[in-house]
A protein has these predicted regions:
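N-terminal catalytic or cofactor-binding beta/alpha core of small enzyme domains
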Residues: 2-170, 175-294
Length: 294
């Protein structure tokens, strides 16, 4: 069942509200959306859903980064359908969610700030004039306005679980294009993971049991790639149970498609998250030390 408007609460956490106001006020104006959205904050599940590329919004001060409007509707600006799926899944499994408030073209919330791909000047054939030759102060301005508040909101939610004595699970929601360049991507959904198999492996098994689904194991992207900042920073480094989901965008273009995938994934996750033994710190995370390159 799709979530109602009553379930949505958009807010800033105490941490983000206490951040120095200067840079953010200079970039974000009164008509701009907040840097993150908190959805279904009263969810009772010991899990947090995050969505890094939920929005195509660009601060008015950045003048759409010099792009035509139609370019901001492309996948280079956001993960199409991911926000709606994250909200529907949040309602389906009764877990809070934090969604990024700005386009990945402003600053990519799933990248470290020092990563060159955090501020993309050219992507999938599209030049982004407003990202060309960015100075370090300009990058810091965007980070302070959009990247840092989002990650502080996630950290605050996870800390609240810990204050209650819980080890929370983290579920990251993304979407991907059916074709990228000349590569045709046959998967309906991908399950991304690195060392911790506790959610990913049973989720793969449950999704593969669904008739007609092509399910990718670390496809079309790999959870072992070091660029997946949000999961690495908030979950993997802390030993929290976690998984990243990638659903093909053409599956998420209609309300019925969103509802179908929220039901499919939600049903599988509900069984997995019902296991109390899941909610412990993953001790094997130290196995990364001395390993080969990812």
């Amino acid at each position: 069942m799709p979530p109602t408007d009553a379930a949505r609460v958009t807010t800033r956490t105490a941490e983000s509200a206490e951040a120095p106001p200067g840079p953010r006020e200079r970039l974000l104006g009164a008509g701009d959306p907040p840097p993150f959205e908190t959805f279904h904050p009263a969810g009772r599940r010991r899990a947090l859903i995050v969505c890094d590329h939920a929005s195509r919004a660009i601060p008015a001060a950045l003048d759409r980064l010099g792009l035509p409007d139609e370019a901001t509707w492309r996948h280079i600006a956001w993960d199409i359908g991911a926000a709606e799926l994250a909200r529907a899944l949040s309602a389906r499994i009764d877990a809070p969610a934090v969604l990024a408030g700005y386009s990945r073209l402003v600053v990519d919330c799933n990248r470290r700030l020092e990563d060159p791909n955090c501020f993309v000047a050219f992507g999938d054939g599209q030049r982004v004039p407003g990202n060309e030759n960015l100075s370090d102060p300009e990058k810091r301005l965007r980070a302070a306005a959009c990247h840092e508040p989002y990650h502080k909101a996630i950290a605050a939610r996870l800390q609240e679980f810990r204050r209650q004595g819980a080890v929370p699970a983290v579920i990251s929601v993304h979407s991907f294009t059916p074709v990228l360049g000349t590569e045709v991507r046959p998967w309906n959904v991908g399950v991304l993971w690195d060392h911790d198999p506790r959610i990913a492996v049973p989720l793969l098994a449950r999704l593969r049991a669904e008739p007609g689904l092509v399910v990718g194991d670390n496809q079309p992207y790999s959870g072992r790639h070091p660029a997946d900042y949000t999961v690495d920073h908030h979950a993997e480094s802390a030993g929290l149970p976690h998984v990243c989901l990638e659903v093909r965008q053409d599956e998420l273009l209609t309300p019925s498609g969103i509802a179908r995938w929220a039901e499919l994934i939600g049903r599988a996750l509900t069984d997995i998250l019902a296991d109390d033994s899941l909610y412990t710190v993953w001790q094997a995370r130290e196995s990364r030390a001395g390993g080969g390159s990812r």
